[in-house]
Amino acid sequence: MFMKRVLIISYYWPPTGGSGVQRWVKFAKYLPSEGWQPVIYTPENPEQLAVDASLEAEVPAVAEVLKRRIVEPYELYKKVLRRSGHSKEAVEVNPVNAQNKSMLQKIAMWVRGNLFRPDPRCLWIGPSVRYLKKYLAEHPVDLIVSTGPPQSMHMIGLRLAQETGLPWIADFRDPWTKIFYFKHLQMTRATERWHKKMEKKVLDGATAVVAVSPLVQQEFQTMTQTPVELITNGFDECDFHAEPFAMAYGGPAIDFCITHTGLFAADGNPTVLWDVLSEKCKADAEFRKHLKINLIGKTDEQILKAICDAGLEENLMNMGYLEHARAIDEQRKASLLILPLRKEPEYKAVLPGKLFEYLASWRPVLGIGQTDGAMSMILQDTKAGIVLEWEDKDAMRRYVDECWEKHLKGELKATEGDISRFSRINLTRRMAQLFDRLTAHP
């Protein structure tokens, strides 16, 4: 079967784990069935906060994977922190995410914000463009896709499109200058102007732009004449092929599992929820006996401390990073899935990747964040759960009580609406249709 070829420039690729990997691994998995051969360009030695070798099985045999070494400033940063006596946890946390920054971390933030533009992967831009120009001369493709962050991937895509004349899609998994941590990077005014100029250059230079959230799509469309498409993240039906766990619907002899999967950052710590659970445990011995707080993925130590300080240490199960399939199993066994957003105004526009796998788990979802944000719209539309403000203690108590009562009766179900539009197969079909439009000959 003849297939067109698409070059996908992505920093994240298996065996690296995490949500940043899964979007384009899943697209690559299903693109061949839509007539497209994926050619992935990715670093040989990326920074890996999580490793999930199981994702390598998702990459189709027809895919071509090109790997080149990258200079990683974060490795030098970690060595300096270790030598200065920082804890293992502090060393592993990106300085952007560190809450109580040491002087060394503050210096690292300034260096990262002003000397590495647009991000610490900028040292890969020039070598990548030179390598890919030579590669494409010998192995032509029909289309280029860059996916960011890191935004350096878009800089590679921009220069490559300019020098080859190929159509190019800039896929934004997160915004650029409107991402929550942008304002924390301690940039000079000149650096901030440079970022806004380059963001505009990428948006205008792309043949098409893809956003994963409707609010980000709208924001980008006000900034450029380039068409901005909405193609969200999603769930892979193959990951959910087994029958739902019967125990997940509850019963008086079954544990009441409140589960969070993925990165759990300190600035998304739902302290009010821990207070609600603590008070209910004190008032209801049966609830205390059956409550399990399951945390899967990288969890900030401040969150673990907050849970223990609330008297919930015996109920806590900190499982760490699990392979994707095991994480999904735990989601499906949950009584309640929690999705606290970071306490940043920019998160109103965010649709976390885990949201869609939460939907496919058919469990009730308690979101904590802006009640008028993008995530709230999805949960309302699918009737899969609710989003409450961070400090709305009474509403959280009522929702936990409601889920607990349904759990005891074995009636705990969720996601009544249609979620088929979020399946990876349907999303890949839409992406392939965009590919076809951009490469159609007049």
Please state what every model-predicted region is.
Residues T42-G126:
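A conserved catalytic-core segment of Leloir-type glycosyltransferases
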Residues R130-K133, S152-M155, R159-E163, W176-T177, ...:
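Membrane-proximal helix-turn-helix segments that form the acceptor-binding/catalytic region
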Residues Y74-K79, F235-I254:
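Acidic anion/phosphate-binding donor-loop and adjacent secondary structure
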Residues L215, G234:
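Carbohydrate-associated surface elements
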Residues H290-G297, Q302-I328:
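Nucleotide-activated donor-binding/catalytic signature segment of Leloir-type glycosyltransferases, i.e.
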Residues T207, N315-M317, Q331-K348:
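Acidic donor-binding loop of glycosyltransferase active sites
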Residues G250-G268, W274-L277, L427:
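Conserved donor-binding/catalytic core segment of Leloir-type glycosyltransferases
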